[in-house]
């Protein structure tokens, strides 16, 4: 699991967001988001800003290592 993937899962859970709504706001299909979260699809660099915006966090938050407190 990538850091971005783990953070997306954590943020979606913490904010109690609907995955379908996150996908819509990110401009991707619900299936694409599901594939990303399940590790079946790689998160392209050009998707990161849209995903961060969709979960209402700054881009660096997706790269933060929560376990290390960074």
Where in the sequence are the language-model features?
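A short, Lys/Arg-rich alpha-helix, primarily the initiator
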Residues: 1-18
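Small-residue (primarily alanine) positions within well-ordered alpha-helices
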Residues: 5, 23-26, 52
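Residues that mark the N-terminal boundary/hinge immediately upstream of a DNA-recognition element
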Residues: 7, 18, 44-47, 58
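Short, charged recognition helix plus adjacent turn
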Residues: 10, 16, 35, 53, ...
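Short alpha-helical DNA-recognition segment
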Residues: 16-35
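The DNA-recognition helices of helix-turn-helix-type DNA-binding domains
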Residues: 29, 40, 66-69
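Short, basic-rich loop-to-helix N-cap that marks the start of a DNA-contacting helix
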Residues: 40-53
């Amino acid at each position: 699991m990538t850091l971005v993937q783990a953070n997306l899962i954590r943020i979606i859970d913490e904010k109690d967001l609907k995955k379908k709504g996150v996908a819509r706001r990110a401009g991707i299909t619900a299936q694409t988001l599901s594939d990303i979260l399940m590790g079946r699809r790689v998160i392209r660099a050009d998707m990161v800003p849209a995903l961060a915006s969709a979960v209402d966090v700054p881009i660096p938050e997706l790269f933060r290592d929560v376990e290390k407190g960074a």
